[in-house]
């Protein structure tokens, strides 16, 4: 899981992979920054295995019927949502509300960190000793994020596949791997839908910042292993483009395209069975992924944002006050963990 390598590394249980002589060459297999969640102090404790990110899914047929253009900014997204809602249809913005959020990492739980990064903010301070959740940009981003559900009434829980297939939800942000599910299990809408970059914030020069946070898994080597060199050779083999392509193709041949690997290897993704246009769209959005570091006590940040959200959504608490109060709890836990492991 996303958070486990750092949790184990700070307990001195993992091997620092950056100490291997050819690490610098191996890490080039992945998108720039993919290793960030697996860094601790001056070491790197996992190789990216899978990496997931969001894309905008839209129904071409319904967009044409309603006269909607594919939105590039959040303002355009909300304008399109208004047209869709007036037609008694829904818009989907993902929120992970089950137990998997505890190990998924803050970047994969909701779009709040994405909105925060697009607005120029960060989750943690530069030295990673505290959060920046009480900063003005964090509060503005959280207010916007929560307003999607409180003011615009986007559903918090929904079945993306069923609603998108039926046309009940013609626009939604979803993990890019939903692409294969729709291709295989919804042949009746083949050619009637597409993918695009997620909405972003317009910069002063007119360009759009549509960066986003990501999720995924990593592969590790235990520090007490008596076969570190052999384990490293295995990780290099496992994360290579050849192995990832073969593994994914074998899964697809046995279980169908829905099992296509969400590989972190960039060359492997290009060699999998995506259409040329969609491959280019995926790669361009993948380049915009900015991973959030995992820090000691960072699991409280995931919980804090979740609790702050529900206090706004369920209890009507003011978004800024809710996030600020929870950020103090996170900072206290980070400080406690840093003291416990001799970092302060």
Give the role of each language-model region.
Residues 48, 213, 274-329:
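C-terminal capping/gating helix-and-loop segments adjacent to ligand/active sites or protein-protein/ligand interfaces
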Residues 57-60, 214-227, 312:
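A bilobed periplasmic-binding-protein/Venus flytrap-type ligand-binding module shared by bacterial periplasmic
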């Amino acid at each position: 899981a996303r958070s486990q390598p750092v949790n184990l590394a700070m307990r001195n249980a993992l091997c620092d992979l950056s100490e291997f002589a050819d690490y610098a060459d191996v890490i080039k297999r992945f998108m720039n920054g993919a290793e960030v969640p697996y860094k601790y102090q001056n070491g790197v404790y996992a190789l990216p295995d899978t990496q997931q990110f969001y894309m905008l899914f839209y129904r071409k047929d319904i967009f044409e019927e309603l006269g909607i253009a594919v939105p590039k900014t959040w303002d355009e997204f909300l304008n399109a949502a208004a047209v869709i809602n007036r037609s008694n249809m829904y818009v989907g913005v993902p929120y992970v509300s089950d137990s998997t959020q505890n190990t998924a990492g803050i970047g994969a739980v909701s779009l709040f960190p994405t909105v925060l990064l697009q607005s120029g903010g960060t989750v943690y301070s530069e030295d990673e000793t505290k959060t920046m959740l009480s900063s003005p940009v964090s509060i503005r981003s959280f207010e916007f994020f929560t307003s999607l559900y409180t003011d615009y009434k986007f559903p918090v829980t929904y079945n993306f596949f069923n609603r998108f297939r039926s046309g009940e939800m013609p626009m939604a942000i979803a993990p890019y791997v939903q692409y294969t599910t729709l291709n295989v299990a919804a042949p009746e809408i083949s050619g009637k839908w597409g993918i695009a970059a997620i909405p972003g914030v317009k910069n002063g020069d007119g360009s759009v910042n549509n960066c986003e946070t990501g999720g995924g898994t990593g592969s590790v080597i235990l520090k007490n292993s008596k076969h570190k060199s052999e384990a490293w050779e295995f990780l290099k083999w496992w994360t290579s483009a050849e192995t990832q392509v073969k593994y994914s193709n074998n899964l697809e041949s046995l279980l169908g395209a829905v099992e296509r690997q969400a590989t972190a290897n960039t060359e492997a993704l290009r060699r999998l069975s995506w259409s040329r246009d969609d491959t280019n769209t995926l790669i361009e959005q993948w380049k915009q992924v900015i991973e959030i570091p995992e820090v000691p006590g960072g699991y409280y940040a995931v919980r804090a944002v979740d609790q702050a959200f529900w206090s706004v959504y369920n209890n009507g608490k003011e978004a800024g006050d809710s996030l600020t109060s929870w950020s103090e709890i996170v900072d206290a836990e980070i400080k406690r963990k840093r003291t416990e492991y001799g970092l302060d």
